[in-house]
């Protein structure tokens, strides 16, 4: 099963925004939890790296996240 994900990171200043798109093939017997955990771990690693370089949002907001996207959306964006 192939999954597509967008991860976005921002500290709210619109100068250092980063967006990543991933395509990952999982075994047919992979559970939803395993897939979610894989992408959550990927997101968390990128989040930690991003905020080791850039200051966190001054307003305390959260401008980061991740979501599943369709194959057509992925292909349009890469």
Feature names for model-found ranges:
Residues 2-29:
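N-terminal acidic leader/helix
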Residues 29-35:
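Short, conserved charged micro-motifs
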Residues 2-4, 16, 32, 50, ...:
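Low-complexity, intrinsically disordered short peptide segments enriched in small/polar/basic residues
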